[in-house]
């Protein structure tokens, strides 16, 4: 079983974004900070999610269960409905990755409970820009 946490941070006035990805497997953590192309927070949250699932796919077997955590309501709702009016292209890429695993459980969590990925995203934002 893999636990995946993602979060994004955006400097709204400048349009810079970064992401934090936290992967937990067998009590080991993989912490990843990434520079994102997105220039607003919603795009950045989808991009961070996509990058998180790409990283998990690199290290997980197809028969693994992935438990995904996000504090982005729009990402969570879109994943559950498998529909996003303005983000369908990004969503389809994420769903394709999710469908490659035997089971993915999506969870919405509060900002406070997503502190690990949040801190990584903030650190990345300040180190990249």
PLM segments and residue spans:
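RNase H-like nuclease fold core
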Residues: 1-43, 55
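Short, Lys/Arg-enriched, disordered terminal segments
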Residues: 1, 127-129
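Phosphate-ester processing/binding pockets and catalytic centers
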Residues: 24, 29-38, 60-65, 74-76, ...
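Short amphipathic alpha-helical face segments that pack within enzyme cores
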Residues: 43, 47-51
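RNase H catalytic domain
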Residues: 9-13, 50-120, 127
